């Protein structure tokens, strides 16, 4: 075993134990509602958002279904104490005296805060060719490049704004992919979500900018329940990226989001996530519970949805970005890197549901386990009886660092059409003494060696991220691997 205390390897120890740099809560005057979840809470959230009646009914229907479910799902390979849903704040937002009409009206302190977090929103410094919607606790505080996008007919705004301005689109698509009765956490989200992003790409338009949403949980007693809805009309294309951080608290916060994607005929949606929620301290105390439902519907012929995710944060991750391949010749893709360290737990993967003819799906999953963490891949490939000529390829690779981490793979294949072709391969490997020694002999220290091995292991996934975010994701993995060889 490699001695991480030797002078040559001390850099690796430092690399692995880097402090979480987004950990300080930001000080603002905050508007909240009382803890607890009742029908009155739902009505109060809807009232604060000034919502039409159909949205209140949508929420109440979800809340009543959630009450009927009574228990969280227990099949995931996860261990955590029971969540007290009555000891949580369901609405938290920076106080604002009036509705904001432009970035110029946003509190300068708030803008400065996002800049410190690496998300500049001001005109002079904002990210080139990337439109950003910044979500702070329960509300959107700023959206960039809205006017430029509007010239192309692209709608990109907070979902609360879309409810007011585009009710017909919301009625048609909200809940069409993830219903109000889908699962325990999606029901909770549908009942209490207060913001998120809405995007509509009109027919035959290729969105001229990358779209991005940045999520920040700042209140230690509140959960975050954002909802994202993206609709790509016929012949359109959009690339969307989300990122997230949270302060360090000794207690756990709940993040229960829902993402719905709809791709019509010949449309393509590329959805990328770099998730860096606070993962807890070195003893496993604190951190975010990341219980998320993400699903895309390839509703039209020749449509395509690609999920790419880099998961490095949160104490517990429970998410399965999925594709329902309804349209003939539609394509679903899933590229994932899930890194766990210390006492993190992840149960993540995907579902590919083949319904239409000649549908294709591709799954590339890379799991990296270090410290005392456990990392599970769970995948479902389902070929329906009418999915003539369906094709799937799945590759699930796990990499272990150290002697105390775990990696698990739970593939599930349901094939009901004899013309289908399904391939599945999996591997588990470990970074060993010989590999590190090989690098050391060539003048490369252990810190760089680990980074190079990890980078090569994840390259196929990083290649599917927008270039500037692929570079950041590569750095992020290096920073997260603290004390991982011993």
UniProtKB/Swiss-Prot annotation:
UniProt entry keywords in alphabetical sequence: Cyanelle, Plastid
A Gene Ontology cellular-component term: cyanelle
GO biological process: iron-sulfur cluster assembly
Cellular location(s): Plastid, Cyanelle
Superkingdom: Eukaryota
SUPFAM superfamilies cross-referenced by the UniProt entry: Stabilizer of iron transporter SufD
PANTHER family the record matches: FES CLUSTER ASSEMBLY PROTEIN SUF (PTHR30508), UPF0051 PROTEIN ABCI8, CHLOROPLASTIC-RELATED (PTHR30508:SF1)
Family: Belongs to the iron-sulfur cluster assembly SufBD family.
Name used for this protein in its record: Iron-sulfur cluster assembly SufBD family protein ycf24
Native species: Cyanophora paradoxa
């Amino acid at each position: 075993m490699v001695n991480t205390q030797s002078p040559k390897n001390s850099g690796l120890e430092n690399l692995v134990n880097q402090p979480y740099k987004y950990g300080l809560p930001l000080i603002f005057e905050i508007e909240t509602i009382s803890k607890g979840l009742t029908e009155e809470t739902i009505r109060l959230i809807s009232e604060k958002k000034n919502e039409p009646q159909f949205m209140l009914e949508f929420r109440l229907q979800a809340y009543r279904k959630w009450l009927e479910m009574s228990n969280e799902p227990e099949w995931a390979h996860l261990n955590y104490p029971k969540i007290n849903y009555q000891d949580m704040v369901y609405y938290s937002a920076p106080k604002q005296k009036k509705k904001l009409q432009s970035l110029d009206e946003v509190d300068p302190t708030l803008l400065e805060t996002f800049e410190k977090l690496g998300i500049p929103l001001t005109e002079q410094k904002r990210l080139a060719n990337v439109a950003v919607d910044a979500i702070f606790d329960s509300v959107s505080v700023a959206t960039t490049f809205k006017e430029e996008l509007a010239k192309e007919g692209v709608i990109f705004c907070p979902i609360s704004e879309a409810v007011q301005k585009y009710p017909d689109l919301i009625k048609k698509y909200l809940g069409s992919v993830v219903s109000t009765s889908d699962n325990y956490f999606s029901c909770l989200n549908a009942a209490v979500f207060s913001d998120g992003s809405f995007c509509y790409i009109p027919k035959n338009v290729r969105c001229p900018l990358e779209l991005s949403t940045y999520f920040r949980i700042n209140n230690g007693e509140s959960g975050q329940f954002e909802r994202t809805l993206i609709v790509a009309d016929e012949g359109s294309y959009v690339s969307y990226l989300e990122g997230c951080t949270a302060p360090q608290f000794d207690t756990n916060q709940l993040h229960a989001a829902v993402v719905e994607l709809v791709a019509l005929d010949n449309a393509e949606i590329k959805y990328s996530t770099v998730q860096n929620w606070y993962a807890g301290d070195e003893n496993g105390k604190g951190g975010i519970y990341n219980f998320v439902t993400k699903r895309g519907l390839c509703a039209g012929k020749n449509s395509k949805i690609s999920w790419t995710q880099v998961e490095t944060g949160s104490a517990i991750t429970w998410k399965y970005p999925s594709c329902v391949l309804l349209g003939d010749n539609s394509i679903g893709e899933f590229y994932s890197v899930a890194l766990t360290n210390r006492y993190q737990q992840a149960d993540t993967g995907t579902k590919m549901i083949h319904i239409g003819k000649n549908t294709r799906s591709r799954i590339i999953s890379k799991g990296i386990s270090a410290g005392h963490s456990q990392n599970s891949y769970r995948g479902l490939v389902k070929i329906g009886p009418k999915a003539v000529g369906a094709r799937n390829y799945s590759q699930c690779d796990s990499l272990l660092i150290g002697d105390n981490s775990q990696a698990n793979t739970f593939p599930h294949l349901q094939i009901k059409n004899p013309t289908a072709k399904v391939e599945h391969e999996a591997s588990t490997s470990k970074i060993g003494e010989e590999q590190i020694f090989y690098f050391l002999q060539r003048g490369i220290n252990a810190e760089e060696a680990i980074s190079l091995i990890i980078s090569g292991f994840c390259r196929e996934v990083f290649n599917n991220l927008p270039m500037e975010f692929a570079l950041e994701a590569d750095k992020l993995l290096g920073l997260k691997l603290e004390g991982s060889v011993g």
